[in-house]
């Protein structure tokens, strides 16, 4: 008899543009075990040529039993003939924010395992239950803190994307977002497959556990259908506006015409403008709700002047609106020989040999000239230039931005670590504006990427 879990796995494999080697993240819990078993069965039964599986268990070393549980998963994979790797989170753990830190480390270790096992992408067993919890948490956080586009307008309601690019290099796919956990457990029970229940999933000290309990006692909550597609459509519209209305000069100054500067009440334009501002400011998140409210009032007024929001100066003049990083709290970064580092959340500096020091270019003469030549007012060019990085070798010799012995590339904090699939079009528009290549395309068809609910 057909089963929804197996059908979902088959449809997931059919969504690939070409067959791939898939790394399945397997904790030993029901969701990930169900994903592993379903994909293994689908590949075997349908004779999906060219597909293969590998698996990885991340041992966070937060519980005494975790090492044995990881070995149990390894034995299960061995019985199925699936290559498996255990990656352990070594070192000290933070005393606060442990779940967020564990999540970041988990993706880092999974990406390393994918490289080691020759996998092209990673599959994770997040379910509809996880999606409901995520939506509930993001909506709660969005009330008053500007989650999403800076107005609390429900980007959190889109939940987790069915695809996510990690670290600009490997796609993480979530094929089970439309399935309930109960369906997956029924599928496993029918096949006599057991799973591990992590006691931390019942610990009310964690926000997700508390949200899960509230959802259960309230009889469940609907996951808004189509929000991922709505988010993708909004991203596409915002991307078009970035391309048409915003000129980014030398990755230092963004220019907007006077005509469009005050149209902040258009949600797609607001999102486009705030996205570019966040990138210029080296931020990983959009501005907070209260900040956006003040900024919107300033832009609506049409009056010339300057306002700072999210480390970015919004400089409004008769000729247009100009955005640039404020000249405050600019760091000094030491980069060792052959190493790389992130400066000010905006630039990645890779040493090609000797150690270098990165600091703000106090004089900014080179960049002032370039920005003036690009048509910017002299005052704007000067202000934008003083926040450019200057690289000095250990012997103190100054080096021009991007010249040997260091390579400099713009860092896009909003997207370079985690890029949801439904934001890829906008992320590409931002990358091109800042002189970067587009992000890698996903291995599955776009029409299926966004089926996250």
Swiss-Prot record:
List where in the cell it is found.
Cytoplasm
One GO BP on record is:
tRNA modification
Residues annotated as binding ATP are: 27-32
InterPro entries xrefs: Rossmann-like_a/b/a_fold (IPR014729), TilS/TtcA_N (IPR011063), tRNA_Ile_lys_synt (IPR012094), tRNA_Ile_lys_synt_N (IPR012795)
**Catalytic activity annotated for this protein?**
cytidine(34) in tRNA(Ile2) + L-lysine + ATP = lysidine(34) in tRNA(Ile2) + AMP + diphosphate + H(+)
Under Enzyme Commission nomenclature, its number is 6.3.4.19
Gene3D superfamilies, per database record: HUPs
Task: Classify the source by domain of life.
Answer: Bacteria
Q: Which GO terms describe its molecular function?
A: ATP binding; tRNA(Ile)-lysidine synthase activity
Classify the main location. cytoplasm
Keywords, A to Z? ATP-binding, Cytoplasm, Ligase, Nucleotide-binding, tRNA processing
An annotated GO cellular component of this protein is: cytoplasm
What is the protein's known function? Answer: Ligates lysine onto the cytidine present at position 34 of the AUA codon-specific tRNA(Ile) that contains the anticodon CAU, in an ATP-dependent manner. Cytidine is converted to lysidine, thus changing the amino acid specificity of the tRNA from methionine to isoleucine.
Stated family = Belongs to the tRNA(Ile)-lysidine synthase family.
NCBIfam families in the record: lysidine_TilS_N
Q: What is known of its domains?
A: The N-terminal region contains the highly conserved SGGXDS motif, predicted to be a P-loop motif involved in ATP binding.
The name of this protein is tRNA(Ile)-lysidine synthase
Q: Which organism is it from?
A: Rhizobium meliloti (strain 1021)
């Amino acid at each position: 008899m057909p089963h929804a879990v197996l059908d979902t796995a088959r449809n997931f494999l059919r969504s690939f543009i070409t067959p791939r080697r898939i790394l399945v993240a397997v904790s030993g819990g029901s969701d990930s075990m169900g994903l592993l078993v379903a994909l293994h069965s689908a590949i075997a039964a349908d004779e999906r040529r060219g597909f293969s599986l590998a698996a990885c268990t991340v041992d966070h070393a937060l519980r005494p039993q975790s090492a044995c549980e990881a070995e149990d998963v390894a034995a299960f994979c061995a019985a199925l003939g699936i290559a498996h790797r255990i990656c352990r989170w070594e070192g000290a753990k933070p005393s606060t924010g442990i779940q967020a830190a564990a999540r970041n480390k988990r993706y880092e270790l999974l990406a390393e395992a994918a490289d080691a096992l020759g996998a092209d992408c990673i599959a994770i067993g997040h379910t509809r239950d996880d999606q409901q919890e995520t939506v509930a948490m993001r909506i709660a956080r969005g009330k008053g803190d500007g989650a999403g586009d800076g107005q609390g307008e429900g980007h959190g309601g889109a939940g987790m994307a069915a695809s996510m690019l990690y670290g600009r290099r490997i796609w993480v796919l979530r094929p089970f977002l439309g399935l309930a956990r109960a369906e997956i457990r029924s599928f496993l029970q029918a096949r006599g497959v057991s799973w591990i229940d992590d006691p931390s999933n019942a610990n009310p000290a964690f926000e997700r556990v508390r949200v899960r309990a509230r959802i259960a006692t309230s009889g469940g909550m609907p996951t808004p259908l189509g929000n991922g597609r709505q988010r993708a459509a909004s991203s596409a519209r915002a991307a078009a506006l970035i391309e048409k209305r915003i000129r980014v000069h030398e990755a230092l100054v963004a220019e907007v015409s006077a005509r469009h500067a005050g149209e902040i009440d258009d949600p797609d334009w607001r999102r486009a403008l705030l996205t570019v501002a966040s990138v210029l400011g080296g931020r990983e998140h959009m501005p907070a709700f209260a900040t956006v409210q003040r900024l919107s009032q300033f832009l609506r007024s049409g009056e010339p002047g300057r306002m700072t929001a999210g480390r970015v100066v919004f400089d409004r003049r008769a000729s247009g609106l100009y955005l640039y990083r404020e000249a405050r709290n600019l760091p000094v970064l030491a980069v060792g020989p052959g190493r790389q580092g992130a400066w000010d959340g905006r630039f990645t500096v890779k040493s090609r040999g000797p150690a270098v020091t990165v600091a703000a270019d106090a004089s900014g003469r080179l960049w002032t000239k370039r920005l003036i030549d690009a048509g910017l007012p002299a005052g704007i060019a000067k202000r934008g230039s003083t926040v450019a990085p200057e690289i000095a070798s250990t012997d103190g010799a100054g080096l021009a931005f991007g010249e040997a012995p260091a390579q400099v590339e713009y860092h896009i904090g909003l997207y370079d670590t985690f890029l949801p699939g439904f934001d890829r079009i906008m992320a590409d528009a931002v990358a091109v504006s800042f002189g970067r290549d587009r992000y890698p395309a996903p291995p599955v068809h776009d029409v299926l990427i966004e089926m996250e609910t």
